[in-house]
């Protein structure tokens, strides 16, 4: 066998397993620059742990996560500072560990580290983590996070739930952000683009007769995906960290930052089947030559690409068909306006900036949390002007966000939920956030200092960052 043939064979065999390496809940996470070519085109990136996607971080319900993030970024053509947001974590009493730059912290600078220390007393399910500084996560800094429930009430529905059953979807760009549109869709870090139809694809292996809990995570910066697996149905049992009553579908649409757990019964003929994630981007749609695809391979099937055809989707997921396994009931009274405070968020776009109630979000030089800790409590005095809203304690809030705005649909993400502190609300299309589509809720500002005592290392972040950036405050 020639060297080139051996290399091709090794690469092909290496693609046969797409299980992610697992770390945590107490760990160190190096943030590094690296040149990678997940779709065959080499480019500079920013990565967690030197891999794309970043390593799977795991823990159990009740764990104390202690993740020391070490900034080893040196590529001056890209951002060399960073922050990490632990997407979906409530961060009760640890608002300072939430991660969005200039909302709850200053960025970590090259050569420094910062310990994110938070507990998950009541949360379980499928989450993820990513940079929350400008557009940095689009350049690679994103990975899955799973909190397992040792007493999962739906464990009887599946046989396998481990690192081999996590599926990540990502848009991929051949140049540093913000150049749109994406060149490729990556599934578990591998994919093809029209210019290289022979790049490796992720292979997810199953054994006939077993039931698998797959955890699907959209780490997208922009597109949403229609996700299907040829010849198989999916029984959804979790959405965004919430257990749902089992609901069977043939396909689903998943937006940026969303997560679903579904059970797949490996009861079809031993063979290879296409996994499809079709983006809503006209230039990259379809499945010609294996783009937007991965492979579901039964043990014992030949090592080759599938020949299955996409079947007609007759039972597509409608989110209104999902119901919580345990329904705590929504707060407030069951009609519009049956709350303590109703807020209408009017979204507009002028061609380059987004506005919420006539204000674009522009990151302040002093984080909102630091402003509050220094005694500025009124939203009218907090920066950025027009983008901070006070929420009183022990109140129910109704948000109204109109549809039909340019660039939609806009998948909005609310950090925190019911805890004192400044919490980001923003569109999770990262390019829209960068263009101002965000606000901050200063919830129970007067109690923030008492409820969220910050560690000494947090106090050092801003002076260190300001010195590195030559900022005078």
Curated annotation (Swiss-Prot):
Leader sequence segment:
1-21
Its principal location?
secreted
* Cofactor, free-text remark: Binds 4 Cu cations per monomer.
Superkingdom to which the source organism belongs: Eukaryota
Coiled coil regions in record: none
Please verify whether the record's keywords include Disulfide bond. yes
Keyword Disulfide bond appears in the UniProt entry: yes
A Pfam cross-reference name: Cu-oxidase_3
Q: Where in the cell is it found?
A: Secreted
Q: Which reaction does it catalyse?
A: 4 hydroquinone + O2 = 4 benzosemiquinone + 2 H2O
Return the InterPro entries for the record: Cu-oxidase-like_N, Cu-oxidase_2nd, Cu-oxidase_C, Cu-oxidase_fam, Cu_oxidase_CS, Cu_oxidase_Cu_BS, Cupredoxin
Task: Give its E.C. classification number.
Answer: 1.10.3.2
A GO molecular-function term, please?
copper ion binding
Residues binding Cu cation 3 are 132, 415, 426
Residues in Plastocyanin-like domain copies:
23-148, 160-298, 365-444
Enzyme class label? oxidoreductase
Listed GO cellular component terms? extracellular region
Q: Which GO terms describe its biological process?
A: lignin catabolic process
- Record-linked PANTHER family: FI03373P-RELATED, MULTI-COPPER OXIDASE
What family is this? Answer: Belongs to the multicopper oxidase family.
Q: What does this protein do?
A: Lignin degradation and detoxification of lignin-derived products.
Description of how the protein assembles with itself and partners: Homodimer.
Q: What is this protein called?
A: Laccase-3
Which species expresses this protein natively?
Trametes villosa (White-rot fungus)
């Amino acid at each position: 066998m020639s060297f080139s043939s051996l290399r091709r064979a090794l690469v092909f065999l290496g693609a046969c397993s797409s299980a992610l390496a697992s770390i945590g809940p107490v760990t160190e996470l190096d943030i590094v620059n690296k040149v990678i070519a997940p779709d065959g085109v080499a480019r500079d990136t920013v990565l967690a742990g030197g891999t794309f996607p970043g390593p799977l971080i795991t823990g159990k319900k009740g764990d104390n996560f202690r993740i020391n993030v070490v900034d080893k970024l040196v590529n001056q053509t890209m951002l060399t500072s960073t922050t990490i947001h632990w997407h979906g974590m409530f961060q009760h009493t640890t608002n300072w560990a939430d991660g969005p730059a200039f909302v709850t912290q200053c960025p970590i600078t090259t050569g420094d580290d910062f310990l994110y220390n938070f507990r998950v007393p009541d949360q379980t399910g499928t989450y993820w983590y990513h940079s929350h500084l400008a557009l940095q996560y689009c350049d690679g800094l994103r990975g899955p996070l799973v909190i397992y429930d040792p007493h999962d009430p739906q464990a009887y529905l599946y046989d396998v739930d481990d690192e081999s059953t996590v599926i990540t979807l990502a848009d991929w760009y051949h140049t540093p952000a913000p150049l749109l549109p994406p060149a490729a869709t990556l599934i578990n870090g591998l994919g093809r683009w029209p210019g290289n139809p022979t790049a490796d694809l992720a292979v997810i292996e199953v054994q006939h007769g077993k039931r698998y809990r797959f955890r699907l995570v959209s780490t997208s910066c922009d597109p949403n995906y229609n996700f299907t697996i040829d010849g198989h149905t999916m029984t959804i049992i979790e959405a965004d960290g919430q257990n749902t009553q089992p609901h069977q579908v043939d396909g689903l649409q998943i937006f940026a930052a969303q997560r679903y757990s579904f059970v797949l019964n490996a009861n079809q003929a031993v063979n290879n089947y296409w996994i499809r994630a079709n983006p809503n981007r006209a230039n990259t749609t379809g499945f010609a030559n294996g783009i937007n695809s991965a492979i579901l391979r039964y043990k014992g099937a030949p090592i080759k690409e599938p020949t299955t055809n996409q079947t007609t989707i007759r039972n597509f997921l409608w989110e209104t068909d999902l119901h919580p396994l345990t329904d705590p009931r929504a707060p407030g009274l069951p009609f519009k306006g049956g709350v303590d405070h109703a807020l209408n968020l009017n979204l507009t776009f002028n061609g380059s900036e987004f506005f919420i109630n006539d204000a674009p979000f522009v990151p302040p030089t002093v984080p909102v949390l630091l402003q509050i800790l220094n005694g500025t409590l009124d939203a009218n005095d907090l920066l950025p002007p027009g983008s901070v809203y006070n929420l009183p304690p022990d109140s129910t809030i109704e948000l109204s966000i109109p549809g039909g705005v340019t660039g939609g649909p806009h998948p909005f993400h609310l950090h925190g939920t019911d805890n004192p502190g400044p919490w980001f609300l923003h569109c999770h299309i990262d390019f829209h956030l960068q263009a101002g589509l965000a606000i901050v809720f200063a919830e129970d500002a007067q109690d923030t200092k008492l409820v969220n005592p910050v560690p000494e290392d947090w106090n050092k972040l801003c002076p260190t960052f300001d010195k590195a950036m030559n900022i005078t405050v």
